A protein has these predicted regions:
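Hydrophobic, low-acid, alpha-helix-prone terminal segments
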Residues: 1-5, 9
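A cross-taxon signal for low-complexity, glycine/charged-rich
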Residues: 10-32
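C-terminal regulatory/interaction module of P-loop NTP-utilizing enzymes
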Residues: 35-347
Length: 347
């Protein structure tokens, strides 16, 4: 008997396939029965070699980042550290992981967090129904060796891999991008487990051994700050607060993402949203809402903002009735006048 579970070392094999190999304490290796086809056979793109190239990389996918975000992303990629992005919903945190995946040519593996998330949903679980069918079939054929049956059913073909385990698998396109989205929705127990995974990028499966990534994934963790995430997890990462963009940057974002909107309307949309964020709202509109509003106004063939149009379309910008109620009466007109006044002053 082994004093500890054997270790599964994931190694690339020949012919573009991937082999799982089991290493015991004695150093013996036995090839596992199953193989896993890499999901992406394209050559990986080199990581950006500077902060400016990191910002340019994001810009390729029309993600207009400021230099501070470019700096922390560059350092995270260079140092192989997870990046922890915190900020209000709708400011573009999740999009960063998607952009990194597309521009670098890597797989995107997303773990959407929620209350009650456990190892079975985040890491792995066994296909119990398939295991029972296999046991019944083996017994029907006269197989009664308990040890052999246990070895067979706790093999990789019955293992259902969830995002965290998938992220440790090798890929010919390079290490994947692992997005752990809205970590603040989980509990402290899951945070503690995640901290252990991020420490060594390995996962122990008691029935099989320890799976360790040959090349750690690019990890992006996001939080909407609905609660404070434990300091221990944040210390493992490089941290960046993603705030609302300046008017100039938001204007550039809208022009890039919704190019069909006229220059005049785009400027009015951004100026109004910027003014709206200064109000005492339960949930201020994010960049996502700005883009949705610009697209909606374009669909309505609006050429310039007026109080009636703004009031009719507030549901695109604001998602809480209390916030919409705060803008009743002359408030919309006052904000619109303020926005237009700022535009005239900037001319």
């Amino acid at each position: 008997l082994l004093d500890r579970p054997p270790e599964l070392v994931i190694e690339p094999a020949t012919l573009g396939r991937t082999r799982w190999r089991m290493t015991t304490e004695r150093g013996d290796k036995s090839a596992a029965d199953d193989y896993i086809e890499p999901m992406n056979k394209t050559s990986p793109r080199a990581l950006p070699a500077s902060i400016d190239l990191t910002v340019a990389l994001l810009a390729e996918a029309e993600y207009l980042a400021d230099r501070s975000l470019g700096t922390v992303l560059y350092l995270a990629l260079k140092m192989g550290r997870p990046i922890f992005l915190e900020g209000e919903a709708g400011v573009g945190k999740t999009e960063i992981a998607k952009v990194l995946s597309s521009t670098l040519g890597r797989r995107l593996i997303r773990l959407q967090c929620y209350e009650g998330l456990d190892i079975g949903a985040a890491v792995y679980e066994w296909n119990y129904a398939a295991q029972m069918i296999s046991i019944r079939a083996a017994e029907a054929e006269g197989e009664h060796d308990r040890a052999r049956l246990e070895h067979d059913v706790f093999s990789e073909r019955f293992l259902i891999k969830r995002p965290l385990l998938q992220a440790l698998e090798p890929d010919t396109a390079g290490a994947p991008v692992l997005l752990i989205d809205e970590i603040d929705r989980t509990d402290e127990a899951f945070e503690a487990y995640l901290l252990e995974v991020l420490a060594d990028f390995q996962i122990t499966i008691p029935e099989m051994g320890t799976v360790k990534a040959a090349h750690p994934p690019i990890v992006v963790i996001t939080s909407n700050r609905t609660r404070e995430v434990h300091d221990a997890l944040k210390r493992r990462c490089l941290y960046h607060w993603v705030g609302y963009p300046t008017a100039e940057r938001e204007l550039a974002i809208v022009r890039a993402k919704v190019p069909g909107v006229s220059k005049k309307l785009t400027e009015q949309v951004v100026a109004f949203v910027q003014a709206l964020r200064k109000q005492d709202l339960f949930k201020s509109p994010g960049v996502a809402e700005t883009l949705d509003w610009a697209a909606a106004l374009s669909e309505l063939d609006v050429v310039a903002l007026d109080p009636a149009t703004v009031s009719d379309t507030l549901g695109v910008l604001l998602k809480y009735q209390d916030d919409i109620a705060r803008l009743e009466g002359s408030k919309v007109k006052d904000l619109l006048d303020e926005a237009k006044s700022e535009l005239r002053a900037a001319e």
